[in-house]
């Protein structure tokens, strides 16, 4: 048996933590006088880095902006971090784990933090729907493949 066949896949959460939090209500208290019919915008971003052999940090950045017309009611940003031990996988499987599986684990923590911050700002409760990070990751891979295809066509 080769050494590669002996390597078992292993996944463990070492730590989940809040890396950064920001909440702004730039138009308070005037915004509280208006009818609450906001336009809510959700932005997501993930980043990962290798900390040691088989140890990775994944950071999920969630930004929620609620606007009433042209005015920002609130802007809330949370960077939810996690340290994960991941062994026995590489390539596309590792990229999927770091880009979809780990963010799926982190999102409920970020969502709870955002809900709490919005509530502390005395705004109506904000319920963020679950996010399909697997679909987002597949879209990312497709965009990468299309980008490489375009580069190859330009080189030809």
UniProtKB/Swiss-Prot annotation:
The record's GO molecular-function terms, alphabetically, read: unfolded protein binding
Subcellular location per the Swiss-Prot or TrEMBL entry: Cytoplasm
**Which biological process terms from the Gene Ontology are attached to this UniProt entry?**
protein folding; protein tetramerization; protein transport
Q: Where is the signal peptide?
A: none
Q: What are the alphabetically sorted keywords of the record?
A: Chaperone, Cytoplasm, Protein transport, Translocation, Transport
Mind naming one GO cellular-component term on file for this protein? cytoplasm
Q: What is its main location?
A: cytoplasm
**Which NCBIfam families does the entry mention?**
PRK05751.1-1 (NF004390), PRK05751.1-4 (NF004393), secB (TIGR00809)
Q: Which PANTHER family match?
A: PROTEIN-EXPORT PROTEIN SECB, PTHR36918
Please give the function described in this protein's UniProt entry: One of the proteins required for the normal export of preproteins out of the cell cytoplasm. It is a molecular chaperone that binds to a subset of precursor proteins, maintaining them in a translocation-competent state. It also specifically binds to its receptor SecA.
List the protein's name.
Protein-export protein SecB
Phylogenetic lineage: Bacteria, Pseudomonadati, Pseudomonadota, Gammaproteobacteria, Enterobacterales
